[in-house]
C-alpha cells in the first residue's frame, strides 16, 4: 500500500478522491511538526497530500484545496469547542498549540496565506504570536 510507505507520524495515512486533481490523493501527517504535540493530550499534525502519477509520488499540496478545507473545518470546530469550555486565554492556547499550528500550516499548504494570518490572530491568544508564526514558517519553508 502506497500510503503506508510514506512516513506519516501520528496521523494514519488515507486516500481520498479530490475533485481538484480529479483523482486520488494520499493524505499523510507532516512529521516536521510532531514536536508541537509534546504537551498535548490529543495529537494532530498538519497534512500533506501526495499524488501517484506514472509510478512516482509527488507532493500535491499546491493542487489540492478541498482536502485542506475539510481538515481545517474539523480543526476550527475543535478549537471553538476548546475555547468555549476552557476560556479564551493564553493558557488554553498552549494546550491546543498543535491544533493552531495544524490549521495555520494547512491554510499555507492550500495557498491561503491571508486566511492563515486571520486564523492565527483569532486563535493564538498569547503575546508572542509573531515569534510563533516565524517558528512555524521556518519549519514550513524547509520543505516547500
Predicted regions, residues:
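A short beta-strand motif characteristic of beta-propeller blades
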Residues: 2-7
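Repeated scaffold domains used in trafficking and secretory/extracellular systems
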Residues: 8-18
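Generic structural motif recognizing short loop/turn segments at the entrances and edges of beta-strands
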Residues: 12, 21-25, 46
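Acidic/hydrophobic-patterned starts of short beta strands in beta-sheet-rich repeat architectures
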Residues: 18-34
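Acidic, small-residue rich beta-repeat scaffolds with periodic aromatic anchors
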Residues: 29-144
